[in-house]
Amino acid sequence: MLYPLLGVFGLCAGVTTLLFGFGGGFFAVPLLYALLLTSHAAGSPVALHAMQIAVATSATLMIFSSALATWRHQRAGTLRWDLVRPLAPAIALGAMAGAWAALYLDSTWLRWLFIGYLLLSLLDAWLRPGFMRVGNHGPVPLGKAAATLAGLPIGALAALLGVGGSVMTVPLMRRRGASMGTATAMANPLSLPMALAATLVYALVPAPGANLGAGLLGYIDLRAALAMAAGAWLGMHLAAPLLGRLSDTLHARAYLALLACVLVVMLVTGR
């Protein structure tokens, strides 16, 4: 495994976690998936489970990156905990179900689910009103029932695909009146319960017959996660001066542009 390259992956993940709430998954999953396929023989256990390893390692990275980004946003005063608390328990429950399902899905199917999820997210944000421009009113908190109904699928899909909750929570909060700064800041603490629950499942409940070798805890590549975490720390340090300095429109466009870049990477990366 090329650890300096993983450090660069982590640096990109750190920047996008702090500024866009991605938690690292949108960079870590496609890049680690591609690296695993190119560094292991076709048909080997690691190659056959490359997507699961990428997703599981991404979830582990998110524990570190989302926690650090949450701390930085708390210091910057950009967090709204009244919007975070109602969603967190349902996201954690959904994440456990999503991670368990990912263990038993074929890696190719998981890849295409990831691609489909990205494409739908882009189309929804671009075509449905409420994402590119929001009103002047402040964000409206979700009620308990609405938070549960929204949190369960957010947690399940985020853990299934290893992407964090940003791609669902940011559009949700945008359409409830949140600025991009507030919406992306809240994506980080909302990714934490997902990352913790998913990592627990990926570490302790591996799929039967998956003998992946040393250095892995369940499906989690611990060495890759550590290398990317080091890069993520540096990336957040470099991105910190930009917090609160991006215009809302530029922030929203950059968010969608990053999703489009990841979609292209996943489309051109295959077995």
Predicted regions and their residues:
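Juxtamembrane transmembrane-helix boundary motif
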Residues: M1-F20, F27-I53, T57, S66-L160, ...
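Conserved, well-structured core segments that form the ligand-binding/active-site neighborhood
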Residues: V163
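A conserved regulatory-domain signal marking ACT and ACT-like small-molecule sensing domains
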Residues: A185-P189
